[in-house]
């Protein structure tokens, strides 16, 4: 268009030098050359761009292949549930119930968010109960299921080892429990004085939220010691971490795998989890430094902080981040399970007040023969009715649907020839074992003294205790895979219940009966909206 315009202009101006008339032709030739050159450049650029895109996509594919867990071959058993779509927890419970009934003694699978889980028949428990971690691994199972790298669910997320905390619980906490009972009792009394009103008349209490804080205080006394265990910022930190970490996991999982690292900056719950770790580092820094000095001099406190430092390798011992996370992880485990177990027991007692007097009579009889200021490690097991009531409550209101969850590390051949391949997730159906008609008489009915009566039979003294494990007692696992903290938890739970039963009458607000438990990922949780009425007992 510019060339035509120039030519017309020249025709109307005859005074212009004639050799200029040839310039538009040369300009046209130059423009054609330039367009041809530009075309070649653009073509080459497009080729480079396409090549760059292909390389980028290939790099992303390689990166994904590196971070994506390698899935084992699909297990040859019926898949009864798919959690990768919208989660229906009621359907999951129904599925596992039906699976246990329809495939009793056989395998079935659940497609969970983190991968396929093979539900094993209980007949294989005996051959798996003693296998070491390098064959059946808990750390890897938890890390994959709870996305620990991003959620900070376990100590592995900051470079530590779960085994360090486990060793502290096994080798120190459990063995010194007898010396800690006085501290546990003192903290239970203190926590009720601080958190429960006088209750001279019937007083409405948000019992579950109160118990979360009571358990945090009592556990903190053993985990970090006074005065930090009563520090409000410390208590808020461990409670908020416990609540936020469970909500954070499904939100992290919603991110594309390669972008999950961004959740730390973009997601409110994940940011809160990391903030809790930063707070714990700040709070624990002087305590950890002081404890290290004491340990070097051959002294030191009797608490989890000191035991974790003692059992740490050099890397863990030198890392404030790891030591702080150990406090968070241990507190989370205690607060989450213990508070719910106590709440369920209180709900069962409030719904069945006929059990209160026999439990009080048992406590009174024990005190008559052992007039101690508090229950010690040797006297606590003598409360057989209380132990039985707790076990029955736990049987019908478990924390989890499944137990003994593990990830297979090395090939394992079972006695029927089935091979469990590396990378596979396994579990046993806890809730269904607890409700098996072949194991329990009238399993759907609550019998608070069921296990006391079973223990009275010859040879059953230890078999049916609250902390007992076995093929028909999966609440705390089995064999080397049993929960190492169950003895501390049991004594803490009983101490709280003894104080409550001894000092208060309680009932539900209104004639509501036993409230239904709620479903959340993993199992039953007591309904947090339920309120309990407390009234202080007048004792002679």
UniProtKB/Swiss-Prot annotation:
What role is this protein assigned? Cytochrome P450 monooxygenase; part of the gene cluster that mediates the biosynthesis of PR-toxin, a bicyclic sesquiterpene belonging to the eremophilane class and acting as a mycotoxin. The first step of the pathway is catalyzed by the aristolochene synthase which performs the cyclization of trans,trans-farnesyl diphosphate (FPP) to the bicyclic sesquiterpene aristolochene. Following the formation of aristolochene, the non-oxygenated aristolochene is converted to the trioxygenated intermediate eremofortin B, via 7-epi-neopetasone.
- The EC code for this enzyme is 1.-.-.-
Primary localization class, coarse:
membrane
Q: Which CDD domains match?
A: CYP503A1-like
- Please tell me where heme binds in this chain: 483
GO molecular function annotations of the record: heme binding; iron ion binding; monooxygenase activity; oxidoreductase activity, acting on paired donors, with incorporation or reduction of molecular oxygen
Summarize the record's disruption phenotype note.
Answer: Impairs the production of PR-toxin as well as of the intermediate eremofortin A, but accumulates eremofortin B.
**What family is this?**
Belongs to the cytochrome P450 family.
Pfam families assigned to the protein according to its UniProt record, in alphabetical order: p450
> Which metal ions or organic cofactors does this protein require, according to UniProt?
heme
Report whether Transmembrane shows up as a keyword of the record: yes
Bilayer-spanning residue ranges? 48-68
Q: Per its UniProt record, what SUPFAM superfamilies does this chain match?
A: Cytochrome P450 (SSF48264)
Q: What is this protein called?
A: Cytochrome P450 monooxygenase ORF5
**Per the record's keyword annotation, is NAD included, yes or no?**
no
Supply one GO CC term from the record. membrane
What gene is this protein a product of? ORF5
Q: InterPro entries from the entry?
A: Cyt_P450, Cyt_P450_CS, Cyt_P450_E_grp-IV, Cyt_P450_sf
**Protein topology in the membrane:** Single-pass membrane protein
Organism, as annotated: Penicillium roqueforti (strain FM164)
> What metabolic or biological pathway is this protein involved in?
Sesquiterpene biosynthesis
